[in-house]
Curated annotation (Swiss-Prot):
Contacts the emerging nascent chain on the ribosome. Belongs to the NAC-alpha family. Disulfide bonds: none annotated. Residues 78-90 have a biased composition (Acidic residues). Residues 65-91 are annotated as: Disordered. It comes from Halobacterium salinarum (strain ATCC 700922 / JCM 11081 / NRC-1) (Halobacterium halobium). This is Nascent polypeptide-associated complex protein. InterPro entries: NAC_A/B_dom_sf (IPR038187), NAC_arc (IPR005231), Nas_poly-pep-assoc_cplx_dom (IPR002715).
Length: 130
């Protein structure tokens, strides 16, 4: 039935096109899945496939996952922020990017929230979500 065991890849591609399914390989260097319990599942150098079936996008991630605590990942970030900041007192650009991504806000709003929270990522995200 399914699985395409022994099926010609070209024939499989034609069938998928007829059904309105578009498949693309993505060049991902890392995939991070954040779980509700505060852990992250991290895939380094994964094979990522994006399938678009009539507007419904599905991503398939293949690789060797590693679980880590999200708080540990933030602390383990590289200490060399020389390119990320304008001066010693500025908020690192990486922190701003995290708030922008997690809270879906503009960069200037994320930076203001981080400054108001004295650089605390969680507090800044909570602040912009209010």
């Amino acid at each position: 039935m399914f699985g395409g065991g022994g099926m010609n890849p070209r024939k499989m591609q034609q069938m998928m096109e007829q059904m309105g399914i578009d498949v693309d390989e993505l060049d991902a260097t890392e995939v991070v899945i954040s779980l509700d319990d505060g852990t992250e599942v991290v895939f380094s150098d994964p094979d990522v496939t994006k399938m678009d079936a009539r507007g419904q996008e599905t991503y398939q991630v293949l690789g060797d996952p590693v679980e880590r605590d999200a708080a540990d990942a933030i602390e383990a970030a590289p200490a060399d922020d020389s390119d990320d900041t304008d001066d010693d007192d500025a908020i690192p650009q990486g922190d701003v990017d995290i708030v922008v991504q997690r809270a879906s806000v503009p960069e200037d709003e994320a930076r203001e929230a981080l400054e108001a929270a004295d650089g605390d990522l969680a507090a800044a995200i909570d602040h912009v979500d209010e």
